[in-house]
């Protein structure tokens, strides 16, 4: 790998630790099931226990990446951009979800599913601004945005379906991000003794 390509791979390394996105995606799904009072997730403490379990899985996955691919500290400006995009995305998701469809008096009450629609657009913007926009980002996040913003979501509140859609998209994106890091840096290496 030439030095320019290595610098680029190192800069994106932190943002391509895709398998961490699998427990995050599962959290979206568990939240939707909890909102629906499904089975054991009807109990709030079960949700908390699952949250702790998923945090443990994410920690283990992060440790896997540290041990097999090393650790890279992103440049301060790139990290600031990532944090800024994350905060802006959260504000947009909250605000636009209320504006597009909610019980608020000022809601437009459109027949859309704003959670996946806005989340897909936000993640597409995040991928373009912080990581390098790749074809799988366009397909996954673009499809999620289109599916959420199609005016076919009349009837009951589709928020929990939207959370499940987001969870599946996050996990799929994570798998493709992981494959990108494997293609770029090679398969996971075993630590050597000595």
What annotation goes with each model-predicted range?
Residues 17-27, 47-51, 119, 162, ...:
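Hydrophobic alpha-helical transmembrane segments of polytopic
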Residues 87-147:
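Membrane-proximal helix-loop-helix units in multi-pass membrane proteins
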Residues 128-194:
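Terminal transmembrane helical module of multi-pass membrane proteins
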Residues 36-48, 98-115, 152-165:
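Membrane-helix interface and helix-disruption motif detector
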Residues 25-31, 54-55, 91-94, 123-126, ...:
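Helical transmembrane-bundle signal
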Residues 1-20:
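N-terminal juxtamembrane cytosolic/stromal segments of multi-pass membrane proteins
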Residues 21-101:
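Selected alpha-helical membrane-embedding segments in polytopic membrane proteins
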Residues 52-60, 117-128, 166-179:
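Alpha-helical transmembrane segments and their membrane-interface exit regions
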